[in-house]
Amino acid sequence: MSSPIQPLPLNVINLIAAGEVIDSIAAVVRELVENALDAGATRLVISLFPESWRVQVADNGTGMTLADLRHCALPHSTSKIHQLDDLWKITTLGFRGEALHSLAQVADLEIASRCTSDGVGWCLRYQSSGEPLREEPTAIAPGTIVTVGNLFGKMPVRRQGLPAISTQLKAVQSFIENMALCHPQVTWQVWHNQRLWLNISPGKTPQQILPQLLKGVHYHDLQFVSQGVKSPQESTQKDLDLIEVTLGLPDRCHRHRPDWVKVGINGRIVRSPPVEQAILVAFSRTLPKDRFPVCFIHLTLCPSQIDWNRHPAKVEIYLHSLDFWQEQVSKLIEQGLRLSPQTLASAAQNQRVGKLLKASEEKASYRVDAKDHQTDANAVGLMPLKAVAQVRNTYIMAEHSTGLWLIEQHIAHERVLYETLQDNWQLIPLETPIILTKLSDNQVEQLARIGLEIEVFGEQLWAVRTVPKLLSTREDCPEALVELSIGGDLQTAQVAVACRSAIRNGTPMTLSQMQELLDQWKTTRNPATCPHGRPIYLSLEESSLSRFFRRHWVIGKSHGI
């Protein structure tokens, strides 16, 4: 006979709950870091001693009074919410009041803290119930130091079941890097067994942070754009919601996995497959095949738009008006991918230019003017590009106010045509149909799928009565239609039509024709790469040309005096 149903003892309830909140070393770091950021910290020092199951987090936040220290580790004790309605007004990273109590349940907990207004700090040790065990005054700078020792000492099975130390440290690193992106103004130091392991300097935007996290990515490989947006459901909202996008320019950096497609909401990285998919779609046909973008989206939204109370670690949320935010993210990414004064100015720092200059730099030493040739980000419109020559009937040489550009004519035109086809996939009827032979059923279905009018004309013969307008006057239109029939979606067909219809390399162009192409290309949505992901242009800024021709040499030395 089974045992009768009865309530669990309180200590068992607390231990079960603590095991759900604190399940690893990374979870300890997560909870303490979020508390520190909620306290306004701008500098965090995290010390890890994983072999001895000890973690310490020190911050320069507002600190706690002695009265708060006595209550902070009690169950469900928090200063962040006070009533039911507050659950829909959450502006902090933490709100449940579970973290410190859970730590007291599964580890030895000690907290030292001092408010700026107090002349002395206090250090308290806690019982597993969260009640203070010992308290004493201590000399400490304003802020808080939380020390967690003997982690999972009361749960030996949990210790044995945890991943290897290296795996746990990787989880800590991933969390810190994510938080650094969401809070770029914060200085981060992580020590492992008293050796500096991770150091992240602060910045104004994630554009300064991301190069510290991703090897091979530089500041000028990235673009940062932001925009205030009025929430669709908040008619009385005074402050605009904010969308910030930090993206890798597709001709300069991309990944073989989508591991750097990240979404942050109100200071925390979250899993949001719909928004992540919107990011991938926005980058479609800008990257090489099987490559993925570097893109970090951070949404700062009205609390009423979000329900955080979905996952213990708050990595999953309910987001109201999801379709609206997907659309806004797509629009802002599109804006970031366009040519702008910022990208024109940063093109001089392109790694491809650096490689061209490297050989010259190795053979001679010369003084380089350290001026930073930045363009006013508030400039209206784009810098004019003036066509000056054609190189080998393939590259357009264009001049602008700060240097020289080389643009490959075929893929620049391909980008123009592709976006035109995206906006207006125009099919026109033919006076005389094109007859195709020996098509499979799949090929016939494919042509019909992309909108072409096709019908049987005889045995193994098919008549195509409508074709894309760009192909209608081409002599190789039948071959192009066979190519389109091979497979792929409408987007693939549009790329194929654009590629076949674009100006071929080796075709002479007049200055007016080149200028017309430049004017069309620089206003496209994704001018950096062709639809196959190849870079379209190379920028040689005046500063780079000066370096190559050694215009900064000291005159006497350059003449051997």
From Swiss-Prot:
One cellular component term from this protein's GO annotations in UniProt: mismatch repair complex
Keywords, ordered alphabetically: DNA damage, DNA repair
Endpoints of the signal sequence: none
Xref: PROSITE patterns: DNA_MISMATCH_REPAIR_1
InterPro entries named in the record: DNA_mismatch_repair_CS (IPR014762), DNA_mismatch_repair_MutL (IPR020667), DNA_mismatch_S5_2-like (IPR013507), HATPase_C_sf (IPR036890), MutL/Mlh/PMS (IPR002099), MutL/Mlh/Pms-like (IPR038973), MutL_C (IPR014790), MutL_C_dimsub (IPR042120)
Record has Calcium as a keyword: no
Gene3D superfamilies named in the record: 3.30.230.10, Histidine kinase-like ATPase, C-terminal domain, MutL, C-terminal domain, dimerisation subdomain, MutL, C-terminal domain, regulatory subdomain
Record-linked Pfam families: DNA_mis_repair, HATPase_c_3, MutL_C
SMART domains in alphabetical order: DNA_mis_repair, MutL_C
One Gene Ontology MF term: mismatched DNA binding
Listed GO biological process terms: mismatch repair
NCBIfam families from the UniProt entry: mutl, PRK00095.2-1
Functional summary from the UniProt entry: This protein is involved in the repair of mismatches in DNA. It is required for dam-dependent methyl-directed DNA mismatch repair. May act as a 'molecular matchmaker', a protein that promotes the formation of a stable complex between two or more DNA-binding proteins in an ATP-dependent manner without itself being part of a final effector complex.
Sequence similarity: Belongs to the DNA mismatch repair MutL/HexB family.
Name this protein carries in UniProt: DNA mismatch repair protein MutL
Source organism per UniProt: Rippkaea orientalis (strain PCC 8801 / RF-1) (Cyanothece sp. (strain PCC 8801))
Lineage: Bacteria, Bacillati, Cyanobacteriota, Cyanophyceae, Oscillatoriophycideae
